C-alpha cells in the first residue's frame, strides 16, 4: 500500500481466505457474522483517534443520555471510506444519530472493499456455476502480500510476537463486535485455544492514547456501542 493501512482495511483483508496453494487448509475461516458492524466501528475508531471526529453526549427525550459524533473540523484523510464517513458526520441531518445507529447504517464492507478494488489491492472475480449463476468475490491482486499480512497476524496472535498498538486495537474490535469468527483458526488447528486466550489478552491491553486532538473515552464508547449492537437482545 502507498499510504497508512487503516484498521478497517486490515480487518477486511484478514477476512479473505489465503490463496497459497501450498496450504491445504485455509488457516482462517470466513464465516458469516458481524463483520460489517465491526468494520464500521474500525472506521469510527480511526477517525476518533486521529481527532477528525469527537464522541459527544446527546440527551434524548425518551432514552436519556446517549452519544453521537461531532466533526472536529474537516480535514481529508486520504482514505475514501473515512472521508465518506466524515461527510456524513458533517451532514446536519445526522446530528441526532446515536453511536449505535452510526454502526448499523454504515455499509462499511462494501465501501472498504470497493476502495481496495479501486486502488488495485483487490480484484473482482466471478465464479460461474452455470449459464446464469455467478458468485462474486474479491481476491488479492498480490497473493504474496496478502499471505504476509496473514502471517504477521499469526505471529502476533498465535506465536506471541510483541503486539503493536494497532494489533491491540484489532483484538478489541473483534471482541467487542463478536466478529472473531472471521479470522479464527479453522476448528482443529493447533493453537486455536491459545488464539482465543491471546485475543482476550490483547483486547484487555488496548488503551487508546489521549491527546489534545482527541479523547480516548470516545474510542471506549465506540467499542461499548459495538458490543451493544451485537448483544443477543439487540436482534442482530
Predicted features by range, described:
Residues 1-104, 218-236:
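Short, amphipathic alpha-helical interface elements at domain boundaries
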Residues 6-28, 98-100, 129-161, 165, ...:
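Intrinsic, low-complexity N-terminal interaction/targeting segments
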Residues 38-42, 107, 111, 168:
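Short, well-structured alpha-helical interface segments that form or flank functional binding sites
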Residues 44-47, 116, 169-175:
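Short, structured motif recognition centered on aromatic/hydrophobic residues
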Residues 51, 120, 178-181:
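Short glycine-centered helix-capping/turn motifs at secondary-structure transition points
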Residues 57-83, 123-155:
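Accessory beta->alpha helical hairpin/"wing" motif in late/C-terminal subdomains of nucleic-acid enzymes
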Residues 87-141:
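Internal, conserved structured core segments that host functional sites
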Residues 137-236:
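Glycine-rich, aromatic-bearing surface loops/beta-hairpins
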Amino acid at each position: 500500500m502507498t499510504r497508512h493501512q487503516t484498521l478497517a482495511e486490515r480487518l477486511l483483508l484478514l477476512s479473505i481466505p489465503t490463496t497459497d496453494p501450498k496450504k491445504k487448509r485455509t488457516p482462517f475461516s470466513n464465516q458469516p457474522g458481524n463483520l460489517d458492524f465491526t468494520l464500521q466501528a474500525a472506521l469510527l475508531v480511526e477517525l476518533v483517534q486521529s481527532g477528525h471526529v469527537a464522541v459527544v453526549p446527546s440527551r434524548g427525550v425518551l432514552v436519556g443520555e446517549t452519544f453521537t459524533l461531532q466533526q472536529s473540523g474537516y480535514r481529508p484523510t486520504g482514505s475514501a471510506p473515512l472521508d465518506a464517513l466524515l461527510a456524513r458526520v458533517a451532514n446536519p441531518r445526522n446530528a441526532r444519530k446515536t453511536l449505535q445507529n452510526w454502526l448499523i447504517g454504515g455499509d462499511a464492507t462494501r465501501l472498504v472493499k470497493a476502495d481496495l478494488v479501486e486502488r488495485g489491492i483487490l480484484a473482482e472475480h466471478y465464479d460461474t456455476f452455470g449459464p446464469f449463476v455467478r458468485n462474486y468475490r474479491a481476491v488479492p491482486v498480490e497473493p504474496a502480500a496478502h499471505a504476509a499480512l496473514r502471517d504477521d497476524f499469526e505471529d502476533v496472535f498465535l506465536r506471541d510476537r510483541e503486539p503493536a498498538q494497532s494489533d491491540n486495537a484489532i483484538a478489541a474490535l473483534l471482541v467487542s463486535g463478536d466478529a472473531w469468527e472471521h479470522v479464527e483458526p479453522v476448528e482443529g488447528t493447533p493453537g486455536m485455544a491459545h488464539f482465543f486466550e491471546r485475543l482476550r489478552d490483547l483486547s484487555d491491553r488496548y488503551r487508546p492514547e489521549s491527546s489534545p486532538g482527541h479523547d480516548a473515552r470516545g474510542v471506549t464508547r465506540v467499542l461499548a456501542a459495538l458490543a451493544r449492537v451485537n448483544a443477543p437482545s439487540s436482534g442482530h
